[in-house]
């Protein structure tokens, strides 16, 4: 059997140094193995110094450890020997004392060359030692292990042309190649770690410079913004100094009132709704008239007479005019008060001239109808004592003697309007003038004596556009019951509304209430004109500015 076919197998025992320093760093172990392989102390010292400079927190150097333990520069490995029964023993067995303790003072030298010579003399190649050393050297990195395994395989594969020299070449070349590879790997790892540390240091420096540049740029931006703000604050004033606050500004209307109106052709609407709202007094009269008409039976409404008379409201307690604490026209509601229709004779005369002059004005031509009449009204009281008395009025024309009207007059309601600023007050009364039946002719009462007689000299001005008739009447009252046959003369001014127009507006109030309201308003407006004219005429007469003939 040749040497290459069956090389002898040997087992390497652990040295004392391996047992003590089995937990040291892998790089330190590699250093020891490299020192044992080539026996070069300077290379180990240089490698140790490089490792200490590149790696922090490393274990203590090997030399220090050896000096502390008292051993030489070379690690001692035990010599292997074989017993008769092929059992493996270590050199430590020989160095044990009698008591069984290990003697650490004995010198141990481990020489790879001597071991190889012994192996060569025995005829066995150092395959296991090389594999063990290679395994220890290849522990630091996986990449180096992979590369070294490839190189080992390439070196172990012999060429076919040199089969005869395999044993000799393998024995002489393997230790030298392993030594060179170990040196290259240790140096490469040391250089790689140094380069890596330098790259990390350079990267850290670059990061520091980048951070410094970023901070500097931020500071520059802030500084530039502050400079801009300082320039703005130095060159311009706050807005409160340039613009006056709204609360301190003078008020300027956005729309100039009445400046765009053509004053030469001024047309004003009655209101913004283009209507004239009724005042409270007018509204009160409208409601009162409506309620009074509504209380009358429908078959009797056609005989309604709504009239307005002027006089002075007198309290029942005395002959003087009432004086309530009011300053404008109002409704006087005291039941005991009454109004006797009568005005001063001089005012009556001036008012007659005033109204006639209005009717004769050119623009009013055809608007007024004037009727003059002289009649005598005789009032009869008829009825049984157990019945409500009836008052019949017979109107006879004085010139012809004919009976012009024979009616029964019933008083329904009245409304007193007090006018403190005027000379006269107003009474609005609503009466019924019912015709006497044919079976009760006027001739029947000619033989009877009337309770009162009144002679009327009347001028009537009918204004159809306002549905109003103005009666200016001079009345002579003949009291038949009094002992003295003296007559009493009164001057009456009376306004009467058109009854058919009033009833038509009343019936149509649900469809068009404006017609009814307008009719009553016009009636009151005509009364206001007469009332104010009487006040102005009385002031002129009694102050002496106007002489009455």
Curated annotation (Swiss-Prot):
Residues 135-157 have a biased composition (Basic and acidic residues). Residues 30-169 are annotated as: Disordered. Its EC number is 3.6.1.74. Optimum pH is 6.5-8.5. The record marks 280 as: Essential for dimer formation. It is found in: Nucleus. InterPro entries: Cet1/Ctl1, CYTH-like_dom_sf, mRNA_triPase_Cet1, mRNA_triPase_Cet1_sf. The active site is at residue 223. The modification Phosphoserine is found at residues 15, 124. Residues 86-96 have a biased composition (Acidic residues). GO terms for cellular component: mRNA capping enzyme complex. Heterodimer. The mRNA-capping enzyme is composed of two separate chains alpha and beta, respectively a mRNA guanylyltransferase and an mRNA 5'-triphosphate monophosphatase. Belongs to the fungal TPase family. Present with 3900 molecules/cell in log phase SD medium. This is mRNA-capping enzyme subunit beta. It comes from Saccharomyces cerevisiae (strain ATCC 204508 / S288c) (Baker's yeast).
């Amino acid at each position: 059997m040749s040497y290459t076919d069956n090389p002898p197998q040997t087992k390497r025992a652990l040295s004392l140094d391996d047992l003590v320093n089995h937990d040291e760093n892998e790089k330190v172990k590699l250093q020891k193995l490299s020192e044992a392989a080539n026996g070069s102390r300077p290379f180990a010292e240089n490698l140790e110094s490089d490792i200490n400079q590149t790696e922090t927190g490393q274990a203590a150097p090997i030399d220090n450890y050896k000096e502390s333990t008292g051993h030489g520069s070379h690690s001692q490995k035990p010599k292997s020997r074989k017993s008769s029964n092929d059992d493996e023993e270590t050199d430590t067995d020989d160095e044990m004392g009698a008591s069984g303790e290990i003697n650490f003072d004995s010198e141990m030298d481990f020489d790879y060359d001597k071991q190889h010579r012994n192996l060569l003399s025995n005829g066995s190649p150092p395959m296991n030692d090389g594999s063990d050393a290679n395994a220890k050297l290849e522990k630091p990195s996986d990449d180096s292990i992979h590369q070294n395994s490839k190189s080992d395989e390439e070196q172990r594969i012999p060429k076919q042309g040199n089969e005869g020299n395999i044993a000799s070449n393998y024995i002489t070349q393997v230790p030298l190649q392993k030594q060179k590879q170990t040196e290259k790997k240790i140096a490469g790892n040391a250089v790689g770690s140094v380069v890596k540390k330098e790259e990390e240091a350079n990267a850290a420096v670059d990061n520091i410079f980048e951070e410094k540049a970023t901070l500097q740029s931020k500071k520059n931006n802030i500084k530039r913004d502050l400079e801009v703000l300082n320039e703005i604050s130095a060159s311009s004033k706050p807005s409160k100094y340039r613009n006056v606050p709204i609360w301190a500004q003078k008020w300027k209307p956005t729309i100039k009132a009445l400046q765009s109106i053509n004053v030469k052709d001024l047309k004003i609407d009655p209101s913004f709704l283009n209507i004239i709202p009724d005042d409270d007094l007018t509204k009160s009269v409208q409601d009162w008239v409506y309620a009074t008409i509504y209380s009358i039976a429908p078959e009797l409404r056609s005989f309604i007479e709504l009239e307005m008379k002027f006089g002075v409201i007198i309290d029942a307690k005395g002959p003087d005019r009432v004086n309530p604490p009011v300053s404008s026209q109002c409704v006087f509601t005291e039941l005991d008060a009454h109004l006797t229709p009568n005005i001063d004779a001089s005012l009556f005369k001036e008012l007659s001239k005033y109204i006639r002059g209005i009717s004769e004005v050119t623009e009013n031509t055809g608007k007024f109808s004037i009727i003059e009449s002289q009649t005598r009204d005789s009032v009869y009281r008829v009825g049984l004592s157990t019945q409500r008395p009836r008052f019949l009025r017979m109107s006879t024309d004085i010139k012809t003697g004919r009976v012009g009207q024979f009616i029964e007059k019933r008083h329904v309601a009245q409304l007193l309007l007090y006018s403190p600023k005027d000379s006269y007050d107003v009474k609005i009364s609503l009466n019924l003038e019912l015709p006497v039946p044919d079976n009760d002719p006027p001739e029947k009462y000619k033989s009877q004596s009337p309770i009162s007689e009144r002679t009327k000299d009347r001028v009537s001005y009918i204004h159809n556009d306002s549905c109003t008739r103005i009666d200016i009447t001079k009345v002579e009252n003949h009291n038949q019951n009094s002992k003295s046959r003296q007559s009493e003369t009164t001057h009456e001014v009376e306004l009467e509304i058109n009854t058919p127009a009033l009833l038509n507006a009343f019936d149509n109030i649900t469809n068009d209430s404006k017609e009814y309201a307008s009719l009553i308003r016009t009636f009151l407006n005509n009364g206001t004109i007469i009332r104010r004219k009487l006040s102005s005429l009385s002031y002129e007469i009694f102050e002496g500015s106007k002489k009455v003939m």
